[in-house]
């Protein structure tokens, strides 16, 4: 990703209710992954820009924390209404900026809207606890209070949903927020800020600062930032977690994944194939809940044959085409990295059942890669261990469910796993022994709804409190205990 000098209008940061040009002089291109068309330029903001945003958020917090909870919730209801009004427009922006298929983009917006719905329930979510007579004439109460200024660092693969995981809940809890979106998908963040302001959010409650590494470090290190929420790759997630935690700040860092789908001998083949295809190749495999490894228990050549047939039938192209499922990866540089993984799989002895590289020449204008399937992959191979984040699927073989579960246990990641079976005993064993935080039973993408935590395990998550659900409320609030005596 090359740095260029600005030649055209550059996106601005949103600070204190105003669109503000970055003090930095460099920008990055924001190309459409399907066409290469440059949609905008995003500024490489500076430490000074971050400080300006944090100071605006700090100033806003002084009054926002005292805004009655029902009034905060009403702003969320207004925001929810505006997101619904602009649903189609936002989905088209996701397609243009991220590249995914329109149907998936529309679904992403819907998931984000559901997060705002959850945040709108703040009066219930923020209720404290009390107990009378903990001792004679003594009562105890617990109240929730906001932390202050908090920050979110979000990825390119869900440029709408992940910010909506974070800032609505943080803000309705009484905090103010600084959002650093991915420099690959910055346009949508500005649109969110615009709609949130229209919904009635006061200046400084939500701020957006674009940029790269310097912005991340400046947010982590700023003395007025109380918590960091991050979603991204494993090396960066670990870095963000360690650097933030070392300063005694709250941090939740969602990381990489290697999600295994187990196909049992009694599985309905067509159902399993349909779910694996959608999970592995939807969004070009660029999601942390994507199926990237299938473990076939016993002999099931029918499943393998049908999987390849369905992969061959996939329509590849621009996400605005309603027939398209498989869309481009985000950047040419990422595709080059994926090609290296494919070559590594060949060199390490996996059988290349379907070579997605052949589709590249048909679409030279975009970052396309066809569905790629390796068979007879072993757990020690690179493609079986590392997150590739692309439409590349590994098929592993296991003699029984115990062996299949051992593959999941050996993985450094623990985001999700799925089993396809009709056997209740196998389901229970899988539920109890699969070493991952989100499990699917005949479900291809077992991602949770907003009222449950998004609960990755092992190297898929660094921190104590997950995003969403009660964990999210606990992350963005602190508790104050009051003990009262009445025997005077």
Swiss-Prot record:
One Gene Ontology biological process: thymine catabolic process
Active site, UniProt feature: 288 (nucleophile)
EC number of this enzyme: 1.2.1.27
Coiled coil segments of this chain: none
Keywords: NAD, Oxidoreductase
Group of enzyme by EC: oxidoreductase
GO function terms (MF aspect): malonate-semialdehyde dehydrogenase (acetylating) activity; methylmalonate-semialdehyde dehydrogenase (acylating, NAD) activity
Reaction equations catalysed: 3-oxopropanoate + NAD(+) + CoA + H2O = hydrogencarbonate + acetyl-CoA + NADH + H(+); 2-methyl-3-oxopropanoate + NAD(+) + CoA + H2O = propanoyl-CoA + hydrogencarbonate + NADH + H(+)
UniProt pathway annotation: Polyol metabolism; myo-inositol degradation into acetyl-CoA; acetyl-CoA from myo-inositol: step 7/7
Role description: Catalyzes the oxidation of malonate semialdehyde (MSA) and methylmalonate semialdehyde (MMSA) into acetyl-CoA and propanoyl-CoA, respectively. Is involved in a myo-inositol catabolic pathway. Bicarbonate, and not CO2, is the end-product of the enzymatic reaction.
NCBIfam families named among the record's database cross-references: MMSDH
Official protein name in the record: Malonate-semialdehyde dehydrogenase 1
Gene source species: Geobacillus kaustophilus (strain HTA426)
């Amino acid at each position: 990703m090359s740095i260029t000098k600005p030649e055209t209008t550059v996106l601005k940061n949103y600070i204190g209710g105003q669109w503000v040009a970055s003090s930095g002089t460099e920008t990055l291109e924001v190309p459409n992954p399907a066409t290469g068309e440059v949609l905008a330029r995003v500024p490489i903001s500076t430490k000074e820009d971050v400080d300006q945003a944090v100071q605006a958020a700090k100033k806003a917090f002084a009054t926002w924390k005292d805004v009655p909870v029902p009034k905060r919730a009403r702003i969320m209801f207004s925001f929810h209404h505006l997101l619904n009004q602009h649903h189609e427009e936002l989905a088209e922006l996701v397609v243009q900026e991220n590249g995914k298929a329109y149907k998936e983009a529309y679904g992403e917006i819907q998931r984000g809207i559901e997060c705002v719905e959850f945040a709108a329930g703040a009066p219930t979510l923020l209720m404290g606890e009390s107990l009378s007579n903990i001792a004679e004439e003594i009562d105890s109460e617990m109240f929730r209070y906001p932390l202050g200024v908090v920050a979110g660092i979000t990825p390119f693969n869900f440029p709408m949903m992940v910010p909506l995981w974070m800032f609505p809940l943080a803000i309705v809890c009484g905090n103010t927020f600084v959002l650093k979106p991915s420099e690959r998908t910055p346009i949508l963040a500005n649109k969110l800020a615009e709609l949130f302001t229209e919904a009635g959010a006061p200046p400084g409650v939500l701020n957006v600062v674009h940029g790269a590494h310097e912005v991340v470090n400046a947010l982590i290190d700023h003395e007025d930032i109380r918590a960091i929420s991050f979603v991204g790759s494993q090396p960066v997630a670990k870095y963000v977690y360690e650097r933030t935690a070392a300063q005694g700040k709250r941090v939740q860092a969602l990381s990489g994944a290697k999600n295994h789908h187990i196909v049992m001998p009694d599985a309905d083949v067509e159902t399993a194939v349909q779910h694996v295809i959608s999970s592995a190749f939807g969004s070009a495999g660029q999601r942390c809940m994507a199926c990237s490894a299938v473990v076939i228990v016993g002999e099931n050549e029918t499943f393998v044959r049908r999987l390849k047939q369905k992969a061959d039938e996939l329509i590849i192209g621009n996400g605005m085409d309603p027939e398209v499922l498989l869309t481009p990866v985000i950047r040419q540089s990422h595709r080059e990295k994926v090609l290296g993984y494919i070559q590594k799989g060949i060199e390490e002895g996996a059988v290349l059942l379907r070579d997605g590289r052949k589709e590249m020449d048909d679409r030279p204008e975009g970052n396309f890669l066809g569905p790629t399937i390796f068979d007879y992959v072993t757990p020690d191979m690179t493609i079986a261990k590392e997150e590739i984040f692309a439409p590349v699927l590994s098929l592993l073989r296991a003699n029984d469910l115990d062996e299949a579960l051992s593959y999941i246990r050996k993985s450094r990641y623990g985001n999700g796993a799925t089993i396809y079976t009709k056997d209740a005993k196998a389901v229970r064993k899988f539920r109890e022994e699969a070493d991952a935080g989100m499990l699917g039973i005949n479900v291809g993408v077992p991602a949770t709804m907003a009222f449950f935590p998004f609960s990755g395990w092992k190297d898929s998550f660094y921190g104590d409190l997950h995003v969403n659900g009660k964990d999210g409320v606990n992350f963005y609030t602190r508790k104050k205990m009051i003990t009262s005596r009445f025997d005077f």
